[in-house]
Amino acid sequence: MRLPTFLKRPRTARQIVGQMGEDEALRYLQKQGLALIERNFRCKGGEIDLVMQDGDTLVFVEVRKRADKNHGGAAASVTPEKQKRLIVAAHIFLQRYKMPPACRFDVIAIDATEMNWLKNAIES
């Protein structure tokens, strides 16, 4: 059940920037021929920004956006702990399927205006 609009907390600047990054990533991946299955899948184990389909492969996408490359940039912010949470969330997502499809974990790293698509960035 969703809360009425007047009860929702205002979104932070960080959440707004994150949403914009996800929007950019989604448009880019759709132009590359991937189809959106689900956005912002949340479960007890974690969250997956985008679940896409690339042919017969299910793709779990983590989107990271940074204003600059300080502190290693967007890709470096996908820590081992974050990777574990993504894998747990993906396992929960895959419980929907009797015969889970092939899958992979990609990262879309956006540093300022530069976007990098890192396929198979996380191994489960």
Swiss-Prot record:
Under InterPro entries, the record lists: Restrct_endonuc-II-like, tRNA_endonuc-like_dom_sf, UPF0102_YraN-like
Entry's Gene Ontology molecular function annotations: nucleic acid binding
- Pfam families of this UniProt entry? UPF0102
**What's the domain of life for this entry?**
Bacteria
Instruction: Please report which protein family the annotation says this sequence is part of.
Output: Belongs to the UPF0102 family.
* Name of the protein: UPF0102 protein HEAR0176
